[in-house]
Amino acid sequence: MSKQIEFNETARRAMEIGVDKLADAVKVTLGPRGRNVVLAKSWGGPTVTNDGVTIAREIDLEDPFENLGAQLVKSVATKTNDVAGDGTTTATVLAQALVRAGLRNVAAGANPIALGAGISKAADAVSEALLAAATPVDDKSGIAQVATVSSRDEQIGELVGEAMTKVGHDGVVTVEESSTLNTELEVTEGVGFDKGFISAYFVTDFDSQEAVLEDALVLLHREKVSSLPDLLPLLEKVAEAGKPLLIIAEDVEGEALSTLVVNAIRKTLKAVAVKAPFFGDRRKAFLDDLAVVTGGQVINPDVGLVLREVGLDVLGTARRVVVTKDSTVIVDGGGSADAIADRAKQLRAEIEATDSDWDREKLEERLAKLAGGVAVIKVGAATETDLKKRKEAVEDAVSAAKAAVEEGIVTGGGAALVQARKALDSLRGSVSGDEALGVEVFNSALSAPLYWIATNAGLDGSVVVNKVSELPAGQGFNAATLEFGDLLADGVVDPVKVTRSAVLNAASVARMVLTTETAIVDKPAEEEDHGHGHHHGHAH
């Protein structure tokens, strides 16, 4: 396929138009008084949203050179979303301001490489200043404030605060669609997985169709259990101990299963058999996790542990086990707190090391189960469109809350960025020439989010920016009430991780655009067919 090539100012100018088109579509949503954007879908009804990354993902421009710029800024939004889960609109607005001011300087003769280096140094300085100014968040009300600001909904904020408090730092909070109109929270304590009893004869509570074992022993086996002579010695020891038994193995079948069922019917031994979840290495890893949680060992002939030879010492324990036809929950396993903490540390290291999003998600699920908490927020709404929008808001709120717990919070409403300009004072002495110009470009861009928050609220953005830059740290403009005041006290806060990700990702993409000298795109097919020359020009 033939290519079209543009050089120098023409290429950069076209990319800037693309950056502006995407950013202008996204920035109308910024702040508590931001507007909505309606997205037409090729199927189904339109989507109404104020989520920056959702809007950015929908945008592809007709002009291929402009589209290059739009796609670069889209990457700012998606990368910020991947790292912090929120702050995508802030990142997009910052990137636009940096590209606009930077390109003006490049057109006036500044060296793009030095300019980019100045922008990078300024971004690092501001990022460190934000981290230093952070206030830690660990209580329910602090988490709820962050979630409320992110979702613009107090009820969602409260639910997310409650969910995060109940499941702890390593717990998992998932968001699902509810079949009712209400938005509710469900918390599962203990370690749960989606496999139920192998036979309905194991049920102990016929009303709820559950098998409930109190003060139970737990047998974990890596392979199938089918031979009765292998299982019988252990069953006799368990019967002597007078405790119920939970068996989790690859499968339980044949004589072994029928013996367990007969004992359950006669009530001579309370036992429940469950298939281990997952496959292959994931199953092995999960059984090892359960061994740590229950304080037992996994029966595994490979390491010399054979079922017919083991005693009660290899069994784990649990205060309570509840098994239904398709789920199992182990509450208060007997594993030592130290062993669980070590295992959690190992999982965190694996999460840090992995490049695969899928692996990371599965490792985080395992970590949450170890920590003993999974919360599900079920989102309900009156219409399909409303449900999508509300679910998106809850997902953003959960991400923001997690980010806040991780690195703390700073003043929201764009004020922290305006006030972080002070961090650039110490930098100015160590840079010169076009690098110093890059620092000033970054300095001017830091006010862009606040400018648009105020503009979207119907005020003069420049006036608000000037006023906020004179206020002490912690104070700023509350666009919800249209008043200046103590934003931390009012609960107008942003997670530091979100703000830092926005700053660093915007700087990175701005550097790419500024240092672009040539743009190459595919020639549209119909133009090739006609054999016409193509002139690509952009009015300045």
Curated annotation (Swiss-Prot):
GO terms for molecular function: ATP binding; ATP-dependent protein folding chaperone; isomerase activity; unfolded protein binding. InterPro entries: Chaperonin_Cpn60_CS, Cpn60/GroEL, Cpn60/GroEL/TCP-1, GroEL-like_apical_dom_sf, GROEL-like_equatorial_sf, TCP-1-like_intermed_sf. Keywords: ATP-binding, Chaperone, Cytoplasm, Isomerase, Nucleotide-binding. Its EC number is 5.6.1.7. One of its GO terms (cellular component) is cytoplasm. Pfam families: Cpn60_TCP1. One of its GO terms (biological process) is protein refolding. Its main location: cytoplasm. It comes from the Bacteria. PANTHER family: 60 KDA HEAT SHOCK PROTEIN, MITOCHONDRIAL. Forms a cylinder of 14 subunits composed of two heptameric rings stacked back-to-back. Interacts with the co-chaperonin GroES. Together with its co-chaperonin GroES, plays an essential role in assisting protein folding. The GroEL-GroES system forms a nano-cage that allows encapsulation of the non-native substrate proteins and provides a physical environment optimized to promote and accelerate protein folding. This is Chaperonin GroEL 1. It comes from Mycobacterium sp. (strain KMS). The lineage of its organism: Bacteria, Bacillati, Actinomycetota, Actinomycetes, Mycobacteriales. The gene is groEL1.
